[in-house]
A protein has these predicted regions:
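FAD-binding core/adjacent interface of flavoenzyme oxidoreductases
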Residues: 2-57, 112-198
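N-terminal Rossmann-like FAD-binding beta1-loop-alpha1 element of flavoenzymes
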Residues: 49-78
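Conserved Rossmann-like nucleotide-cofactor binding loop
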Residues: 62, 84-85, 177
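Histidine-anchored nucleotide/phosphate-binding helix
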Residues: 67-68, 87, 195-198
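Glycine-rich, phosphate-binding/catalytic loops in enzymes
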Residues: 73, 95-96, 187-190
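Conserved N-terminal glycine-rich FAD pyrophosphate-binding loop of Rossmann-like flavoproteins
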Residues: 84-108, 181-185
Length: 198
């Protein structure tokens, strides 16, 4: 709105300083900031330190193969993905045209997942988002443990776990989102993104 631009309350109500207490109540209501909770957070949280040789971020085809190769070479490996299931875009690209090593993509994926789950030095974390990548390969990740469950099933279980990861090597295999090229008549019938063709 032209009368109330974003952040107006930081500039407009700075003077006189002793009036701030009176302004604040109305400003918070108009800005939609709501009330701060007065009770303690009922949820449980935890943190864990993880040291590994190789951290693989993303569990699509590339991430699975990178983690499998590292673990089979005797390296302590951690594979993380923000989705609940391993496989990345392969999960929804299942078709007769999308083959990996002359196999249907879903059967290939199932075989690979079963194989990597048997590797002793590979730890897999799904529903885990890497949020920060600091120097010397120190990363922070948040593992969602119960957010996907119905409220009545959560009980007194831990909601989130903060993972503090120190890795010797980090492989980023987060995939991509295909961006369309913009050109004249790109919206005509028969013009598709390559992912739509598969």
């Amino acid at each position: 709105s032209p009368l109330l631009p974003a952040g107006f309350y930081y500039k407009t109500f700075m003077w006189p300083a002793n009036f701030w207490g009176k302004y604040e109540y109305f400003i918070r209501k108009s800005a939609g900031l709501g009330k701060s909770p007065t009770k303690p957070d009922p949820d449980l949280y935890e943190h864990r330190y993880i040291h590994c040789d190789v951290l693989v971020i993303g569990a699509g085809i590339s991430g699975i193969m990178a983690a499998k190769t590292a673990a089979k070479n005797g390296l302590k490996t951690l594979l993380v993905d923000e989705k609940p299931n391993l496989g990345g875009s392969t999960i929804y690209q299942d078709s007769d045209y999308f083959k990996i090593n002359n196999q249907n993509s879903s059967s290939w994926l199932e075989k690979e997942i079963n194989e990597i789950k048997k590797l002793k030095n590979l730890e897999i974390k799904t529903r885990t988002s890497v949020a920060a990548f600091h120097g010397y390969n120190f990363l922070l990740a948040r593992e969602n443990l119960t957010d996907h469950l119905p409220i009545e099933q959560r009980g007194n279980r831990i909601r989130h776990k903060l993972l503090k990861i120190r890795a010797k090597k980090v492989i980023t295999a987060t995939g991509s989102i295909e961006r369309p090229l913009i050109f004249d008549n790109n919206d005509r019938p028969g013009i598709l993104l390559s992912s739509a063709k598969i």
